[in-house]
Amino acid sequence: MGPLSPARTLRLWGPRSLGVALGVFMTIGFALQLLGGPFQRRLPGLQLRQPSAPSLRPALPSCPPRQRLVFLKTHKSGSSSVLSLLHRYGDQHGLRFALPARYQFGYPKLFQASRVKGYRPQGGGTQLPFHILCHHMRFNLKEVLQVMPSDSFFFSIVRDPAALARSAFSYYKSTSSAFRKSPSLAAFLANPRGFYRPGARGDHYARNLLWFDFGLPFPPEKRAKRGNIHPPRDPNPPQLQVLPSGAGPRAQTLNPNALIHPVSTVTDHRSQISSPASFDLGSSSFIQWGLAWLDSVFDLVMVAEYFDESLVLLADALCWGLDDVVGFMHNAQAGHKQGLSTVSNSGLTAEDRQLTARARAWNNLDWALYVHFNRSLWARIEKYGQGRLQTAVAELRARREALAKHCLVGGEASDPKYITDRRFRPFQFGSAKVLGYILRSGLSPQDQEECERLATPELQYKDKLDAKQFPPTVSLPLKTSRPLSP
């Protein structure tokens, strides 16, 4: 049969059918034209994602992004970089932050809902919902749940206590009495009892800082003098809450005294932390109680030594895109590398290996936290797929590098002495320099806005969000009895 003539085609299809078919073909052609071009407009020239590259979000079914978030910002663990991406995401999506009056929620005291700016307790008037709680606090679940819904996504980050100790010593040397009295970290770890006193001002920075930040109670600790095993306990012990297996809301209360006086038998010997990290603070059963509670509360705990891998898993858990978790490192100290791992001890000198072992032994509760959440992270990686993860991590790093070259002078962080714009100069504290960023000139207005979000330090970004949520009221000028000068 020969080709159909126009008249025969019209008889077979009919005018209406031909119109529908023509519309379909035109729609497909228009869509292909759109998709074929560079349609990512946020940063022209930086379209790194190729059509064949795997997406972090599942193809089918699609999932809505999680936007009720509780991030426990632990100290000296890379948490400022996570905070930066939360600031940026919430700012871009018009989300409402639970903000402190200044920059921390009364730390080192336990978190209280009353410290959230704009918080109204029940019966105190209409309460606008909060989406993100993410600034420094000592975790207190009972009070957090006064501010955030129980189905929020809870997450945090931990770091190898050996690396954390190095960073904390240089940063908090003037704050911690134990660090201040010690000439060096090596001297402190060689004889920590000669410097450290439980309960002394700022000395929570000197031992088991992660455990402290997570709001966990501390067991009785032996003192150097007189062998007293009854030091002062936490004056405000947290009321721990446990999420029972298969339960919905985080609700069930656990008596912290059960952790202070644990049973002596341990059934799972694989989860014990071997000597020297066992030291003298807390039995294995005490530690396992604490870890079980954290598992019941937190949906994800990131690991600083595997920061990029953790970001990919975070994006997957939140159903966010890759660009949502691509950012610059913040609050990094000069001479320190984010993600530098001491876990394997490979490449360390004998002196460094000794310091690492002593730091983990002294911070044995933090070491238990780290080992536990390192294992849980890698179990999550196995479930996600290592090949898929490697592809996503490579894409994330390529995107970060391209953004740095596009946004920053020299394509990298800068010494703070060269940062003249106060909006981008990070707060300097402690003996180590905290690096910041200098933006390139000549950026388009759209690129300038995006690069500013990426480069803004945490304190300045918090102030920006504060002004956005609580704009200053315009007051009338005061009347004066004297005439004004011309």
Curated annotation (Swiss-Prot):
The chain crosses the membrane at residues 19-39. Residues 1-18 are cytoplasmic. It is found in: Golgi apparatus, Golgi stack membrane. It comes from the Eukaryota. InterPro entries: Gal-3-0_sulfotransfrase, P-loop_NTPase. Pathway: Protein modification; carbohydrate sulfation. GO terms for cellular component: extracellular exosome; Golgi cisterna membrane; membrane. The keyword Transmembrane helix applies. It holds the Pfam family Gal-3-0_sulfotr. Optimum pH is 6-7. Expressed mainly in placenta, thymus, testis, ovary, spinal cord, trachea and adrenal gland and at low levels in brain, lung, spleen, prostate, small intestine, colon, stomach thyroid and lymph node. Its main location: Golgi. Residues 40-486 are lumenal. GO terms for biological process: cell-cell signaling; glycolipid biosynthetic process; glycoprotein biosynthetic process; glycoprotein metabolic process; oligosaccharide metabolic process; proteoglycan biosynthetic process; sulfur compound metabolic process. Belongs to the galactose-3-O-sulfotransferase family. This is Galactose-3-O-sulfotransferase 4. It comes from Homo sapiens. The gene is GAL3ST4.
